[in-house]
């Protein structure tokens, strides 16, 4: 059995070990690649300040690249008896390089090691979320333009209210995603700061060069105060969780609309049969399970900030093992959101729109506001026009004019999709993912 990094001359009770290690062997697999990257930057810095020999650094870097390749292929395993990813990487180095492998922990604690792992992992996952959001955004804009002239009922209180259009409906969710991207950008900026060198939260007596590791890992800056660097554990996850929940909120609302509009009582949209599921007893059923699951998964993701906050709610300054539990809800959340985004983009692309909804006379009353406005424009006081049209509706005498003219910004006739796209592009341009990507490629020699 591997010796623990903190092991002394006594053996820990097996049940205590099981309870305290928890799911780390499983969850730390998410962090394996990033633990290697952090170690590569750290030992490069150690060599520069004389804590590693010039002949040792190339050997350690070469072996770390081998471990990275193993993790990249999904073959990295944390062995029984090994507590976490940090211990496993050090064990693998020591098995290959002997005592040289034991030197990589100089000037470092598992506290700042897991902090940098989490930040490297999170910024990579945020980029993938951003990419997936943009794909869905593009699908929505395309559909909005394609069906910009197809009218549909707009609702308030789930009652037919005023004319809307599929151009507005698809475009509304596109603009919502453009706003959501601002939350993702803020989360990325707060994440992309280097905690490495803060050690256990109080720094080190070694002359560490934190600026160097910041540059090597492609961080925008560092978490300067070493106490705050440790305080940031949990806070970073909470901030990112809010961004995830914001995107999930858009998806959940859109999925509810799609389920409702797809049912026979509405019949506004139709899903291809290959995108639906059936019933074991009712042969006619074509169920929108994809949207139902997007809704449920997105609602679950909206609880993520509360889960993180409750775990860290009453913790004072410093590291506590409570923070380990955050990984259980935080690390898998990215995959869940990406899955929902990808499925939403796929199904929106396949969605068919009913272009003859308003042929049904049940929707005639929604043109009442248009009639009131026309009377008011022709000189009738608004309240008198309102009363006149209301009486016509009550008497069953209302004859709608369905030729509507909405021209102001953001209305049926002037969607402003170009402006919405501009909002999205402006936000995307401020992420600067290339700094992260170039730094990681350089570390790996790619």
Write out the residue ranges for each language-model feature.
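Acidic, glycine-rich loop-and-beta core segments that form the ion-binding/anion-interacting portion
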Residues: 217-305
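Glycine-rich cofactor/substrate-binding loops
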Residues: 2-38, 99-100, 267, 282-446
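A helix-coil-helix interface module used to build multimeric assemblies
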Residues: 2-203, 208-214, 221, 277-278, ...
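Short amphipathic alpha-helical segments with heptad-repeat character
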Residues: 119, 123-130, 134, 141, ...
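Alpha-helix capping and helix-loop boundary segments enriched in small/acidic/polar residues
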Residues: 105, 110-113, 157-164, 168, ...
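A general structural motif at alpha-helix termini
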Residues: 60-64, 217, 273-275, 362, ...
């Amino acid at each position: 059995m591997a010796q623990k990094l903190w092991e002394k001359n006594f053996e820990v009770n097996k049940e205590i070990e099981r309870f305290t290690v928890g799911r780390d062997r499983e969850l730390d697999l998410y962090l394996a690649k990033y633990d290697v990257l952090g170690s590569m930057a750290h030992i490069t810095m150690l060599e520069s300040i004389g804590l590693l020999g010039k002949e040792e650094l190339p050997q350690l870097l070469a072996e770390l690249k081998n471990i990275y390749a193993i993790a990249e292929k999904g073959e990295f395993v944390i062995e029984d008896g090994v507590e976490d990813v940090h211990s496993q990487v050090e064990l693998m180095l020591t098995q290959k390089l002997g005592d040289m492998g034991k030197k990589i922990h100089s000037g470092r604690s598992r506290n700042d090691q897991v902090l940098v792992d989490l930040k490297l992992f999170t910024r990579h996952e945020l980029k993938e979320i951003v990419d997936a959001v943009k794909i869905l955004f593009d699908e929505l804009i395309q559909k909005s333009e394609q069906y910009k002239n197809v009218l549909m009922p707009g609702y308030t209180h789930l009652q037919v209210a005023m004319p809307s259009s599929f151009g507005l409906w698809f475009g509304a969710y596109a603009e919502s995603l453009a706003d959501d991207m601002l939350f993702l950008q803020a989360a990325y900026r707060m994440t992309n700061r280097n905690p490495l060198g803060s050690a256990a939260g109080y720094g080190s007596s070694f002359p560490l060069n934190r600026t160097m590791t910041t540059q090597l890992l492609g961080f925008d800056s560092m978490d300067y105060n070493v106490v705050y660097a440790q305080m940031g554990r949990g806070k970073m996850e909470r901030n990112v969780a809010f961004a995830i929940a914001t995107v999930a909120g858009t998806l959940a609302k859109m999925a509810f609309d799609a389920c409702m509009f797809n049912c026979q009582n509405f019949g506004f949209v139709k899903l291809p049969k290959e995108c639906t599921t059936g019933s074991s007893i009712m042969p006619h059923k074509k169920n929108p399970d994809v949207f139902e699951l997007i809704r449920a998964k997105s609602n679950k993701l909206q609880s993520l900030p509360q889960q993180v906050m409750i775990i860290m709610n009453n913790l004072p300054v410093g590291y506590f093992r409570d923070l380990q539990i955050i990984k259980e809800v935080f690390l898998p959340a990215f995959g869940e959101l990406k899955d929902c985004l990808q499925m939403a983009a796929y199904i929106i692309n396949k969605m068919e729109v009913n272009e003859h909804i308003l042929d049904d006379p049940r929707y005639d009353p929604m043109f009442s506001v248009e009639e009131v406005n026309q009377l008011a424009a022709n000189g009738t006081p608004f309240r008198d026009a309102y009363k006149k049209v209301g009486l016509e509706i009550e008497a069953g005498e209302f004859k709608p004019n369905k030729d509507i003219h909405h021209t102001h910004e953001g209305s049926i006739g002037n969607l402003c999709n170009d402006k919405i796209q501009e909002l999205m592009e402006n936000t995307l341009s401020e992420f600067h993912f290339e700094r992260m990507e170039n730094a990681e490629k350089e570390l790996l020699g790619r």
